[in-house]
Structure formats: structure tokens, C-alpha cells
């Protein structure tokens, strides 16, 4: 038996007007609101205005921390207000949302998400990333998908532009990773549906990405910003839920194996998830020998200011042996779809992508 649930979503600058009705669908009268400090400052006024005059009680507003670690997850789990709430409203980027989603597993709570940045698809997914206290990857948790997503393009447009930029970088991976992971064929219905939807993920980025980034840099809520936010949160989020099931995993591949391995390499500087993943996409195309898409995506990375070389993410070719070693521990490497990954091919792909990037 397989049951597939997908998040409802409301998009628009007036999206919070739908919040009381969405809560009523679940009989919810008590909520706790958890998120990043900046995210709460952006989202709370709209949430509170929408709930004013209703029978919904806000039991707590909590800053979750700064990363989705076990310690921060435990703080949510141990909060009396979160234990009492009918619904947890998670506000912020991927790390804030993943913290709340993971805590909700133990608390057995419904989660609504408010992505105040669109740096990844966490607002829609039934998967969450958990990090160690030192920032290295611990692994994944598998919560229920959020029940409802509230996407406010104005909040996203007024957030720091680097998160929008990195979100485009992360979303660039969805279509090629799923296409490669499923390329052996013989897909059952749900995975096939995920692949069909994956085919819709890249073109909106090429169409609206440059304009959207320009608009976000001017704090301008525009059609381009909305289209990119929908693509990152909804398109790629739905694909994630359809391509990640108990009996198969096609949700990520070489690009995320590369990113996850980099998390264990000590180096100066900080690099956003999607920033590094976008370079991993070039590694993926080098790995598969897809020169046409390597050139296309690399040109787009260059146009967007996303990385095209190892040096741009604080790495060098001397790190490649360690990247191969750390990649072995990643879920992507263990799944090995459509066929087992090899150190030799992975190392050669990193070198080839880096060499091509240096020509741009």
C-alpha cells in the first residue's frame, strides 16, 4: 500500500488571510510559531493580523536557533507550548523548517510552513536535513510533509538576495538529478509521476532567474520572484515527495553527494547550500558525459554569479580524494542510482567540471 500526501499551498501577498481557514480544517485553535529571528520579524506581523479576532491562540513564538541540529530540535520537542499546540507554524529557510518538521515527528504535530526565503524546497517536503553541531552532515529525517505552505512573494523579495540566489542554485539540481537517478527505467506510478514533474523544474529558472534576482536585489515583489518561488518551493518540493519513498530513492544524486561531501571539508569562508549544489550540478553533467547541459548550466551559473570552479567554494583539486571519501557516507552514494558510483568516475567528473569552469 502507498499513500501520497502533498502540501496545500497559498501564494500571494495576502496569503496569510487563508491561515484561519486552513487551521479550521484541522480543528486547530492553539499554535506555536517557530523560526529564525529575521524570519519571525518578517512573517509575524502578517500572521498576527490574520489571527486577530479569531479563536486561535498563539501559545509561543520561539527562535529556533541557527541550524537544524539535534540540540535545536530537542528544544522544540521539550517546549511545553509546542507540546500543547495543535499546529506548529514554521517560519524561515530550510534549516528552521527542517528543525520544526523533525521535532514534529516526535511531537506528532501538524506543521504549516512559511518560507521567508526560497533557498530550497524544504517548505514542501517530507524529508529534512539534520546537521552535527560542527556543521557537518548527520543525515536525514523523514517527517510528514507540511500540511499547508504560505508563500508571500513580498517577504521573499525583501529577504537577503543571497538566499534567493542560492535557492536558484539548489533548484537547478532537481531536474537533472532525478532524470539521471531514474534513467534505468522500470518506474512504478509514483516515481514516474515524480519524473514527469521533474521535467518542469529547470526551465522556469532559466526563464525568470536573472530577472528575479535583479528584482530581489531591489526588494521588488514581481512576477519573476513569484514564479521562481513557486518553482523552488512547489515544483521541486512535490518532486521530492514523489521520488523519495520507503522502497526507492531518486530525489538526489551526484550533485548532492558532492555538496554533502563538502560539508566535511574544513575551509575558510561560508557557502550556502544551493551555492555549492549548483557547482555539483556541473559535476553531475561531467559524470554523465552530458557536455551540452554542462555548457548550458555552467553558462547560466556564470550569468547568475553562481560558482563554476572549486576555488569559488573554497576548495581545490587537492581536496578531491577527501571529497570522494566523504561522499561514501552520503545517502546518494549509498543509493547509487541508476548504478553504483565509483571514486574514479566521481574524481574525474570533479576535475572535468572544474577545468571547464576555468575556461569561462
Task: Give a label for each model feature.
Residues 1-84, 310:
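ATP/NTP phosphate-donor binding region
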Residues 16, 40-44, 70, 95-102, ...:
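Short glycine/serine/threonine-rich phosphate/pyrophosphate-binding segments
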Amino acid at each position: 500500500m502507498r499513500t501520497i500526501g502533498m502540501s496545500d499551498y497559498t501564494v500571494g501577498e495576502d496569503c496569510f488571510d487563508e491561515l484561519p481557514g486552513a487551521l479550521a480544517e484541522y480543528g486547530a485553535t492553539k499554535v506555536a510559531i517557530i523560526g529564525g529571528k529575521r524570519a519571525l520579524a518578517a512573517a509575524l506581523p502578517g500572521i498576527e493580523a490574520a489571527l486577530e479576532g479569531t479563536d486561535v491562540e498563539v501559545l509561543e513564538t520561539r527562535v529556533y536557533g541557527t541550524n537544524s541540529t539535534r540540540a535545536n530540535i530537542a528544544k522544540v520537542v521539550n517546549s511545553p507550548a509546542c507540546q500543547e499546540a495543535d499546529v506548529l507554524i514554521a517560519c524561515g529557510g530550510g534549516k528552521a523548517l527542517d528543525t520544526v518538521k523533525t521535532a514534529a515527528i516526535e511531537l506528532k504535530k501538524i506543521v504549516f510552513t512559511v518560507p521567508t526565503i526560497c533557498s530550497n524546497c524544504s517548505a514542501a517536503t517530507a524529508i529534512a536535513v539534520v546537521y552535527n553541531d560542527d556543521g557537518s552532515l548527520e543525515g536525514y529525517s523523514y517527517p510528514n510533509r507540511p500540511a499547508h505552505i504560505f508563500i508571500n512573494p513580498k517577504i521573499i523579495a525583501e529577504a537577503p538576495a543571497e538566499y534567493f540566489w542560492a535557492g536558484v542554485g539548489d533548484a537547478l539540481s532537481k531536474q537533472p538529478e532525478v532524470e539521471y537517478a531514474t534513467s534505468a527505467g522500470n518506474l512504478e506510478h509514483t516515481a514516474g509521476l515524480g519524473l514527469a514533474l521533474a521535467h518542469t523544474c529547470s526551465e522556469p529558472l532559466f526563464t525568470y532567474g536573472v530577472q528575479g534576482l535583479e528584482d530581489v536585489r531591489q526588494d521588488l515583489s514581481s512576477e519573476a520572484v513569484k514564479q521562481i518561488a513557486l518553482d523552488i518551493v512547489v515544483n521541486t518540493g512535490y518532486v521530492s515527495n514523489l521520488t523519495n519513498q520507503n522502497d526507492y530513492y531518486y530525489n538526489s544524486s551526484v550533485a548532492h553527494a558532492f555538496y554533502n561531501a563538502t560539508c566535511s571539508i574544513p575551509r575558510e569562508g561560508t557557502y550556502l547550500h544551493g551555492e555549492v549544489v549548483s557547482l555539483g550540478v556541473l559535476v553531475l553533467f561531467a559524470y554523465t558525459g552530458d557536455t551540452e547541459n554542462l555548457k548550458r548550466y555552467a553558462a547560466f551559473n556564470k550569468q547568475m554569479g553562481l560558482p563554476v570552479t572549486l576555488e569559488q567554494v573554497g576548495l581545490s583539486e587537492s581536496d578531491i580524494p577527501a571529497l570522494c571519501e566523504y561522499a561514501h557516507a552520503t545517502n546518494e552514494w549509498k543509493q547509487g542510482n541508476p548504478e553504483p558510483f565509483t571514486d574514479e568516475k566521481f574524481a574525474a567528473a570533479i576535475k572535468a567540471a572544474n577545468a571547464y569552469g576555468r575556461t569561462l
